[in-house]
Regions:
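Glycine- and Gly-Pro-enriched alpha-helical subdomains that act as flexible
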Residues: 172-205
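Conserved catalytic cysteine-centered active-site region
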Residues: 1-32, 63-70, 132-155
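Beta-strand segments within the central parallel beta-sheet cores of soluble alpha/beta enzyme folds
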Residues: 5-10, 35-41, 85-92, 110-115, ...
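Active-site-proximal gating segment of KS-fold condensing enzymes and close homologs
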Residues: 1, 52-74, 119-136, 195
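Flexible glycine-/small-residue-enriched beta->alpha junction loops
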Residues: 28-79
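N-terminal extracellular/periplasmic Venus flytrap/periplasmic-binding protein-like
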Residues: 85-173, 178
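Conserved small/polar residues in nucleotide/adenosyl-binding loops
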Residues: 206-213
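Active-site-proximal alpha-helical scaffold in enzymes
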Residues: 11-40, 76-106, 162-169
């Protein structure tokens, strides 16, 4: 109904996760009994080269203006993760995703979307059968002597997901199947050049096994 409130959350890559944090926190305090967290990604709306923010010389001197691919190269170098290891991981990821689609593991999670009555999107277009020779032939995408290529990077994507979060009492009262339980939440900052490591320190607050996993 029109009386239901909503808000927009911006924490870049972690925006939808932050929405989950906010809803679960409000459920714990008793403000609400349930809420829906929605995440939307529309990389096609971002112009080539980004939105051209105002250039600041002092920030440039401190290397603030680096791309996500460059931060990934830093982590790969520090972790001694070779190109071969990255490509092997990428190939296995595609193979697992394709196997899951073929065996209907996502059927209950995907909502078919009708596009102007012309065609229906009901499957992720990202996974593909890996062409190992082509993968090996690709040039580094972000640094001249880097190890990361287009094959081991995320594709340009458009998509959305949603999750219903309720209190246990509300779920049981309304016969809602409980598929997961939120045990805790945390937000932590890291050096911007290592932004890909962001979630790990927060995970370590709850379990000593997170680093090994």
């Amino acid at each position: 109904p029109n009386t239901v409130g909503g808000s927009v959350v911006n924490r870049f890559c972690g925006s939808s996760m932050d929405a989950v944090h906010q809803i679960s926190s409000r459920i714990e305090t008793g403000d609400i009994e349930m809420g829906i967290a929605v995440g939307i990604e529309d990389m096609f709306s971002v112009p080539m080269g980004g939105f051209n923010p105002d250039f600041h010389p002092e920030l440039a001197e401190q290397e603030y203006y680096i791309g996500m691919g460059e931060t990934a190269e830093i982590l790969a170098r520090e972790g001694s993760i070779s190109r071969d290891e990255q490509e092997e991981f990428a190939i296995k990821s595609h193979e697992k995703a394709l196997d899951a689609w073929e065996n209907g593991r996502f059927d209950d999670e995907v909502i078919p979307t009708d596009i102007y009555g012309e065609y229906i999107i009901d499957k992720d277009e990202g996974p593909r059968v890996p062409d190992i020779e082509k993968i090996k032939s690709l040039s580094p995408a972000f640094m001249e002597n880097g190890t990361i290529t287009a094959a081991t990077s995320s594709p340009v994507s458009i998509g959305a997901s949603a999750i219903l979060i309720t209190s246990r009492t509300y779920a049981e009262k309304n016969s809602i199947q409980i598929k997961a339980t939120i045990k805790g939440r945390s937000i932590v900052g890291v050096d911007w050049r290592r932004m890909g490591m962001g979630p790990l320190p927060a995970c370590l607050l709850y379990t000593s096994d997170a680093a090994d996993e």
